[in-house]
Amino acid sequence: METKLQLHGFNNLTKSLSFNIYDICYAQTEEQREAYIDYIDEMYNAERLTQILTDVVKIIGANVLNIARQDYEPHGASVTMLIAEHELSDSEANNEESPGPLPDTIVAHLDKSHVTVHTYPESHPHDGVSTFRADIDVSTCGLISPLKVLNYLIHSFDSDVVTVDYRVRGFTRDVDGTKHYIDHDINSIQNYLTEDTQNAYQMIDVNVYQENLFHTKMMLKEFNLDNYVFGVNAGDLDPAEAQSIEDRLRREMLEIFYSRNVE
């Protein structure tokens, strides 16, 4: 049982969780590439993103103060929510290192926090590989923890590759005046993921514990070509062509996962 920290005044720690979520696809022709980007634009438009972030706010136990959202031309969307912490009971103020809920189970000062999402569809003009990136930031102050939204967000997008960063900044004082630079135990972001999510992804941690900085990279283990080709069935492809497409897609995923080009 985690011991409750008795604070002097408000909890001034800022906890920030950042996601980069990638969906990768193969669209062979120019028409298929345009259709894929149009599909992604519709699937993750500002209205849908607003609903996802509204669910995020509910999961972390906060209230929405203001919403700003925009669909962009030719592609992309963004949503920003200003949120505030409500009164939490001891049971709700939970920073325990454990997974948060899945989707089906559910920019300010001091007690004001924010959540944002921006989308970036793009495609390669020659090799047929298209990617969709969603950047999501959840920043909270006070008792509420952004770590509980991990599972929900990963399952809300077609997440082939995910990079997650969590950091705690500032300090808060206990009743004796001692400064505390983090108010909960954590040794890995992975401990906040459900077992099925952990089993589904290859993961690497790069953590700087003394700086309260945690980083996890995730790449989907299972590869089914039918889930990656757009506008055609993988079974209708020539075996050599199918293998070539799979090689290109796997290379794209590896390059994004390791943040470097593969020669």
Swiss-Prot record:
Originating gene: speD
Known pathway: Amine and polyamine biosynthesis; S-adenosylmethioninamine biosynthesis; S-adenosylmethioninamine from S-adenosyl-L-methionine: step 1/1
Record's function text: Catalyzes the decarboxylation of S-adenosylmethionine to S-adenosylmethioninamine (dcAdoMet), the propylamine donor required for the synthesis of the polyamines spermine and spermidine from the diamine putrescine.
SUPFAM superfamilies for the chain: S-adenosylmethionine decarboxylase
EC number(s) per entry: 4.1.1.50
Superkingdom of the source species: Bacteria
Active site location: S113 (schiff-base intermediate with substrate), H118 (proton acceptor), C141 (proton donor)
UniProt keyword Lyase present: yes
Keyword S-adenosyl-L-methionine: yes
One GO term of the biological process aspect: spermidine biosynthetic process
Name of the protein in question: S-adenosylmethionine decarboxylase proenzyme
Reactions performed catalytically: S-adenosyl-L-methionine + H(+) = S-adenosyl 3-(methylsulfanyl)propylamine + CO2
InterPro entries per UniProt: AdoMetDC_fam_prok, S-AdoMet_deCO2ase_bac, S-AdoMet_deCO2ase_core
UniProt GO molecular function: adenosylmethionine decarboxylase activity
Reported cofactor(s): pyruvate
